[in-house]
């Protein structure tokens, strides 16, 4: 499996706090069959000091990951703001593995018109980026499947969290995540690990096994194959 959403770089956001904690979860990742991880610490604004710290801690963690046998890639999870596109163009925040793909989220709980979200994501598309909307199952104000059909028609990709498919999330979150899976609207399932028991790599493996029982081919596509466009390699079925 390949994980494109993780908060495993230590001491840079609300994820891992220490190098030791990150190493522990990378070992868990390797044990359950995750051999590539895109690191996506939170970023939303031009913060040179934080950016430098992310690079420094990423490099330190990568040395340890190489020993474990997990390849790390750099990226960010972007909290959308009005100036996000400008920051991307100015290279103040980064895409996933310096590709055309970007992982973006919107503030939860905001009573924002969904058309505004569509327009924001279309702006990325119009400028040559491919936006991946992080965990749409969490947006309680927009749990209308037609919203996401429209996004997909426009070229937006969807990433749900593995925990949203098992008993580590609310019933309504699980129900909507499963509906997205049933409708084949999901492009990626990721850990969104914060190096906690609630969001860990065992949960991602359980989610994979659950989808595999429904459709093995689709499970491989959304847990393994689509991710290769980001890390740039050819998938060999190892599961």
Regions found by a protein language model. Name each.
Residues 185-201:
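Short acidic/histidine-rich active-site segments
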Residues 7-9, 42-43, 75-81, 107-109, ...:
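Active-site beta-loop-alpha junctions enriched in small/polar residues
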